[in-house]
């Protein structure tokens, strides 16, 4: 009891310190980008969320857009088979909230930003909603949220779970903390065997762990719509043009690609730059200007009829817009401090996939993509040659598309396995 109390107090102190360290950056985003204005009351517990109706309640949580989006087939199936349940979906980012509202409010879900995980804030919210099941997407588990839910009798599951090498080392160093942090989870449904070994390394029993594969490979027909013609028309790309979509770009990715793009003087090669964070738009623009690349901004009505390069300064369109690509590159993979983003989205939109050397967040998936030749791993030295070859050889591009489709087909049973495990837990609960 004393140990748990001490752990809770130390955790609170850590969160408070982290907040003050991040405060200048937070206030900068508030005053210059208008972020967090709509969500601060919920975040700080000033305003409590309310869930309508009666019946058992399942609370889903994901860090941001990607983690929340992968819940779509799960919520749809849950609603079909267990219509008496109520849904809550939370996320830590405003972009995630917008995505969750678009996807889930029509299903009757209550969506809001997750309050801060300080014991004095989150515990009262958990007590008010009293969830019967809590489901964390991928790995964004919060200690007080989890432990208070368990104290009230909820079941807690991690789905599509993963644990990075960095996090594993950190929790291994503090093995007792790692065990205490994840031990309240009833089940951990993980992406692969490597993540299983990492969780076991920090003290989680193998009896709690299931490996089902990556749920992001699952495509429901409603989510797999390919809008290639729609986006190419909207971007004003002709049938002779070749489009490279550079998604989730960070400044270091831009630096590498700017050098390559400067070699393309052919007006039929179009480049769409999609920043990961819109607040870094000016930095991206300066890097392109420095490289002598002329570009337009989507928000200002620019199109590929006027420019060979466009910056897509709009949120929430990247996955859809991959469908217009002749080549797709996933950013964050030329920045060792980032380690990559979702490698599957281009495949789901039937675009040839490329990524850089830094893929810590999905290293196992990246290795399997390379083995199946469903994705191309490039570095600074090979990037220009690989891109040039793909642009000039339609057969090669089509071969990567077909291998990507085959890869997804082989992996798509991961959702069904995950659902069957969860369903067995739901049906045996006494609500």
From Swiss-Prot:
Protein's pathway:
Bacterial outer membrane biogenesis; LPS core biosynthesis
Reading the lineage from the top rank, the first entry is Bacteria
Reactions catalysed: lipid IVA (E. coli) + CMP-3-deoxy-beta-D-manno-octulosonate = alpha-Kdo-(2->6)-lipid IVA (E. coli) + CMP + H(+); alpha-Kdo-(2->6)-lipid IVA (E. coli) + CMP-3-deoxy-beta-D-manno-octulosonate = alpha-Kdo-(2->4)-alpha-Kdo-(2->6)-lipid IVA (E. coli) + CMP + H(+); alpha-Kdo-(2->4)-alpha-Kdo-(2->6)-lipid IVA (E. coli) + CMP-3-deoxy-beta-D-manno-octulosonate = alpha-Kdo-(2->8)-alpha-Kdo-(2->4)-alpha-Kdo-(2->6)-lipid IVA (E. coli) + CMP + H(+)
Task: Give TM regions.
Answer: 5-27
Q: Please tell me where CMP binds in this chain.
A: 275-276, 315-317, 342-345
Q: Which Gene3D superfamilies match?
A: 3-Deoxy-D-manno-octulosonic-acid transferase, N-terminal domain, Glycogen Phosphorylase B
Spell out the catalytic residues: 67
Q: Entry's Pfam families? A: Glycos_transf_N (PF04413)
Site feature location: Transition state stabilizer: 138, 216
Q: Which GO terms describe its biological process?
A: lipid A biosynthetic process; lipopolysaccharide core region biosynthetic process
Q: What does this protein do?
A: Involved in lipopolysaccharide (LPS) biosynthesis. Catalyzes the transfer of three 3-deoxy-D-manno-octulosonate (Kdo) residues from CMP-Kdo to lipid IV(A), the tetraacyldisaccharide-1,4'-bisphosphate precursor of lipid A. Thus generates the genus-specific LPS epitope of Chlamydia, composed of the trisaccharide alpha-Kdo-(2->8)-alpha-Kdo-(2->4)-alpha-Kdo.
Name the UniProt record assigns to this protein: 3-deoxy-D-manno-octulosonic acid transferase
Name the source organism.
Chlamydia trachomatis serovar L2 (strain ATCC VR-902B / DSM 19102 / 434/Bu)
Cite the source lineage: Bacteria, Pseudomonadati, Chlamydiota, Chlamydiia, Chlamydiales
